[in-house]
Amino acid sequence: GFGGPQGMIMAEAVIDKIARAIGSDPLSVRKRNLYGPTTGSFTPYGMKVEHNLLPDMIAELEETAQYWKRREAIAAFNRESPVIKKGLALTPVKFGISFTAKHLNQAGALVHIYTDGSIQVNHGGTEMGQGLHTKIGQIAANEFGLDLDMIEVTATRTDKVPNTSPTAASSGTDLNGKAVQNACITLKARLAECFAKSLGLEDRAGDVLFINEHVVLDEHKITFTELVQQAYFARVSLSSSGFYKTPKLQYNRDTGEGRPFFYFAYGVSMSEVSVDTLTGEYTVDKVNVLHDVGNSLNPAIDIGQIEGAFIQGMGWLTTEDLKWNEAGKLISENMATYKIPAIGDTPKEFNVKLFGRK
């Protein structure tokens, strides 16, 4: 948001016009202008592109989605079809992850362990249907080696975690998840010390493992709940706050130089559409998306978010339109007048894959 998509579409339009002007395929022009050995590895604002995945991602989608074969088939179709015309495009994206306002790249969390072994987690991120609470719960469950049903992620509230940053900039899980993880690590250290001490092995606390609802040190093993109760009777604190701030960020707004992002996320999308040249009616026939999400915490959520983002972008560029009357009042103000895509507008064939996963 905030002008990013508008800038991106302008750059992509420039690439398309260059391709037409020189009689080349747009994909070939895009590939020649990716970051790399001949084009450089620094952005215009001076940030080094450290993990350049786009060349490999484009090559993979180009092959698996049969770009060149379909390009030939579409050209043949268009020669024979006077009214319905087809189009094909493959578009990459490199998206910086972090707030460009450095102070917003921080998050807090509060984690409580109860004597029945259940855990309550509160963090500063806002759940708006994107699956954030589920991922946060998974992070806590993974740290303690527990099932997700032992974790309760409570509604976000500033009397538990104050001074929360906006849940935006694609950083909600990064920031709040790390804050929760840090709180869990603190609690694990206390529990591990308690367990090792009970065995007379105080110097072995660093070797304690939390696995499958149990706590293990060599041949010694008890359930997580048993250790929690043991810690409670030993007067060990079972509550901790956590904090995280994104590292490596520095950006000079006066010079427009620096490192405003911790890292980049990459994606490649290929769309095949049909357009009725008499009416303007269109259908999205087939979509293939390959997206880099790193080590996915929840592939189902990530794929759903990618699908939703594609449909959202499709609506923005086709049916959605802000309209004002002569008095300056917005008149496309409801679902009847602001045309977001419906279920019938989704691609006939919609394939989303996470890069690096089988």
Located regions from the model:
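Conserved beta-alpha junction segments in alpha/beta enzyme cores
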Residues: G1, A89-S118, H123, E127-Q130, ...
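C-terminal catalytic domains of large/alpha subunits in multi-subunit enzymes
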Residues: G1, P5-V93, I97, Q138-K358
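Conserved strand-to-helix beginnings and helix N-cap segments that scaffold or border functional pockets
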Residues: H133-T134
